[in-house]
Amino acid sequence: MLLGLATISSGDVQLLDCPVPGGLPEALPKVGALVEGPAFYPYLSGRDNLIRFDSADRNADPTTRSARVDHALSRVGLTQAASKKVHAYSLGMKQRLGIANALLQPRELLVLDEPTNGLDPQGTREVRNLIRSLAAEGITIFISSHLLAEIEQICTHLAVMSQGKIVAQGSIAELSASETMRLTLETPDVEAAIEVLRENGITATSDGCVVSADLSSGQIKPEKIVKRLVQAKVAVRAFTVQAPTLEERFVLLTGEGFEVAR
């Protein structure tokens, strides 16, 4: 809908302060986009693909085409592979070429749909670093993704959608914040550890030698728990207190787990 590829059924949408769809002719030249799985001519080189795509852009200046293509390839780290046929590109290289296509013109906004989906670890790292470098240049980047671990590493702000509605939005720190932390303790003295926690108002469960419990901000401090465990002669092999992951927060916000909403 932002890019005018789908019709708005209700409500209002604005893109760079322009109403959609009426203001798209003014807004879209300032917007670059990468839709999941970008398509290229496999028998053409990366450079020739970009030249062909740029030729189809009525806003593109043909006199600067060659220089702009070379600059876009340089920005995404594909200068050395510019003459290679695209069928020989890795998935990560194809994603970077798709981003280069989105950067052929000066952009205020990049819309990236699943930019790391299906990539191996090396390809994921390449695209992640590229996105960070583009953001550092001052470009606003809007990412649609279900890979929450990647979102945590890349984004500064997040909106969570469930069944077509935004159920939460804010900075990553705000959405990851929680009044409840997860306490995990590894010990051979499981029963004694559970008893110490119970005496301090904490209900714990065990799985083998691992004891787990939820610890709210108003309860005893973690360092005092460790002190009392040691005083009770509980052998502590490991002790961690962690905030819920973004994935866990997502499940809490949307109610989506194995039983996905129908």
Segments the model singles out, each with a brief description of its role:
Residues 256-262:
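ABC-family P-loop ATPase nucleotide-binding domain
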Residues 173-177:
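Short acidic-hydrophobic catalytic motif
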Residues 180-253:
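Short, charged/small-residue-rich alpha-helical element at the C-terminal edge
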Residues 1-143, 148-162, 168:
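ABC transporter nucleotide-binding domains
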Residues 166-171, 196-200:
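Short amphipathic beta-strand starts and helix->beta connectors
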Residues 3, 253-254:
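Short, hydrophobic alpha-helical segments
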Residues 59-60, 78, 202, 234, ...:
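Helix N-cap/coil-helix junction residues
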